[in-house]
Amino acid sequence: MNLRPLHDRVIVKRIESETTTASGIVIPDNAAEKPDQGEVLAVGPGKKNDKGELIALNVKVGDRVLFGKYSGQTVKVHRDELLVMKEDDLFAVVEK
């Protein structure tokens, strides 16, 4: 199954956070929080403005983005957990 987001939605795969702190302490899975970063896998065509013109999204496939812990809707595709969310739910693009 392939997903093609509609309108101003994006599909994001969470990027797992480090399980060891800088000082070497290992964080167990049950104490670790959900990652709040991910990679954009697909983007919708955009959102229409009041004049009916299509406005493209600011993010693109491959961007690393920040989002809230509880943002988006989780879906399972080929054993992967992906998030479907609106572009407005994204906080920032992480520049390399």
From Swiss-Prot:
- Subunit details for this protein? Heptamer of 7 subunits arranged in a ring. Interacts with the chaperonin GroEL.
HAMAP family hit by this protein: CH10
Single GO MF annotation: ATP binding
GO BP: any one term = chaperone cofactor-dependent protein refolding
InterPro entries attached to this UniProt entry: Chaperonin_GroES, Chaperonin_GroES_sf, Chaprnonin_Cpn10_CS, GroES-like_sf
| Database matches in CDD domains | cpn10 (cd00320)
Organism domain of life: Bacteria
- Where does it reside? Cytoplasm
Gene Ontology CC annotations of this record: cytoplasm
Q: What is this protein called?
A: Co-chaperonin GroES
Gene transcribed to yield this protein = groES
